[in-house]
Amino acid sequence: MTKYTLDEVNDMYVDVLKEIGNVGSGNAATAIANMVGTRIDMKVPNVKLMDVGKLGSAIGPEEETVIGIFLEVSHDIDGSMMFLLDLESGHYLADKLLMKENVVHEQMEVFDEMELSALKEVGNIITASYLSALASMTNLTILPSVPYICVDMAAAILSVPACLLYTSD
């Protein structure tokens, strides 16, 4: 399998990643909107290439608690994907999916099993939308694993894909 360094990736690669992101996020927004029964406003995805060591600080405070949905991909492409949500968005999405209304959440309120399952499904749909866009645009077969979910500090959650990246080299 071909591996590239950041120095070898040119503007064309970044444009391709942006286009895949546009298609994938559009499909994901439509799927999630249908699930929650409300319109989803999406921003145009941004693509930034950076060393893994800088990833934590790029997404926000490393000690902030976030929700991470992680899965591995295999077949024509081997790798992993992670979808991150802040706690407020996670509670909002879980409440919408489970049809809970007017719920006030404490800042560090723990998610119950049903809420975690609903959020895992959202992450599964979003990552599958991106993978589907990538597969259809490249004619590659890409198989996702069952997703895993974790609620922890951003630095702890991001250490999982970073460790996998360094052990696969």
Regions of interest found by a model, annotated:
Residues 116-140:
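Surface-exposed interaction/gating patches
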Residues 43-56, 144-161:
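Beta-rich nucleic-acid/ligand-interaction surfaces
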Residues 166-169:
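Conserved small/polar residues in nucleotide/adenosyl-binding loops
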Residues 36-44, 137-146:
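Flexible, glycine/charged-enriched surface loops at secondary-structure junctions
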Residues 38-76:
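Translation machinery proteins
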Residues 72-114:
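Ordered, amphipathic secondary-structure segments that act as subunit-interaction surfaces
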Residues 4-15, 57, 111, 133, ...:
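Polyanion-binding surfaces on beta-sheet-dominated domains and ring/shell assemblies
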